[in-house]
């Protein structure tokens, strides 16, 4: 995986970006930062569209991976429409992708991607509420499982499921999963990657929610994304995770997660009304590395 480097300085408001299809975009105010890049409000010179620009140093790896994901997964509108019809859903919870390119500022090359602008993320909401009730978590789980089913059908895993990467649309009924900087092909043309430990990739992702496979340096497969979602739901419901205070000790976090899933019971999740989360984590952590999950069965747990 390409290495990320921190953006040296922000690009000024008003900077003109030209993507590979010659569409021109004008940077507005900086909206935030994530990972190793910056996020800006952006406007298109030729059409009215509400987007953001994600910008990183050209040699950074995250945005390169994200652009690759969008180009492979989100470009074929016919395929997207067919999927929605087959699944009986009215949207796919992945931001629309509008362009990408390279720009130069002060003799430094930057990579950029133009992506649909969304609303608030769950992390922001949790900073005010601390916890979600089980009704909210059920609704979120169903929507995120729909998104993961689609991503996994394209032979990609997300690799970084967390509240900060889950956003509401302008319509609060719509939920989106963002940030595909760690998205990985777990399979190619139907041939699943073998379970192989790569020490260089150990502990990738966000420590509190990283799957056990990712802790070991194994490519995240479908079960890894589902496991991370389980850890997220536990955090959203209880307000804490047993390993939270050890996040700077990845080996310790890994050991605690392994002990947790190997001995999972209602005693290890001692929160009232958390039985659904308990059952979900129990099911997904028993999946084999290459096993295709039954997404509809998982969704039924939350209905």
Curated annotation (Swiss-Prot):
EC number(s) on file: 2.7.11.1
A family per Pfam: Pkinase
Signal peptide positions (record): none
Record keywords: ATP-binding, Kinase, Nucleotide-binding, Serine/threonine-protein kinase, Transferase
Record-linked InterPro entries: CK1_Ser-Thr_kinase, Kinase-like_dom_sf, Prot_kinase_dom, Protein_kinase_ATP_BS, Ser/Thr_kinase_AS
Family indicated by similarity: Belongs to the protein kinase superfamily. Ser/Thr protein kinase family. Poxviruses subfamily.
Name of the protein: Probable serine/threonine-protein kinase FPV212
Source species: Fowlpox virus (strain NVSL) (FPV)
């Amino acid at each position: 995986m390409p290495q990320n480097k921190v953006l040296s300085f922000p690009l000024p408001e008003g900077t003109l970006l030209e993507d590979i299809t010659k569409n021109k975009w004008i940077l507005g105010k900086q909206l935030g930062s994530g990972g190793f890049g910056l996020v800006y409000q952006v406007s298109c010179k030729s059409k009215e569209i509400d987007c953001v620009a994600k910008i990183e140093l050209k040699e950074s790896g995250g945005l390169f991976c994200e652009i690759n994901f969008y180009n492979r997964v989100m470009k074929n509108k016919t395929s997207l429409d067919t999927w929605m019809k087959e699944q009986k859903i009215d949207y796919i919870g992945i931001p629309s992708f509008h362009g990408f390119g390279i720009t130069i500022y002060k003799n430094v090359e930057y990579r950029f991607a133009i992506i649909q602008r969304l609303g608030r993320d769950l992390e922001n909401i949790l900073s005010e509420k601390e916890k979600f009730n089980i009704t909210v978590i059920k609704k979120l789980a169903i929507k995120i499982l729909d998104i993961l089913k689609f991503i996994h059908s394209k032979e990609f895993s997300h690799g970084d499921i967390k509240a900060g990467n889950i956003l509401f649309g302008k319509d609060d009924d719509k939920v989106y999963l963002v940030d595909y900087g760690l998205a990985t092909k777990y399979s190619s043309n139907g041939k699943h990657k073998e379970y192989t430990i790569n020490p260089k990739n150990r502990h990738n992702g966000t420590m509190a929610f990283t799957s056990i496979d990712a802790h070991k340096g194994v490519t995240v497969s479908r079960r890894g994304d589902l496991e991370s979602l389980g850890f997220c739901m536990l955090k959203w419901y209880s307000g804490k995770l047993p390993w939270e205070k050890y996040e700077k000790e990845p080996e310790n976090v890994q050991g605690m997660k392994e002990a947790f899933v190997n001995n999972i019971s209602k005693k290890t999740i001692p929160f009232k009304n958390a039985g659904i989360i308990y059952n979900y984590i129990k099911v997904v952590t028993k999946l084999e590395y290459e096993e295709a999950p039954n997404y509809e069965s998982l969704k039924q747990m939350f209905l």
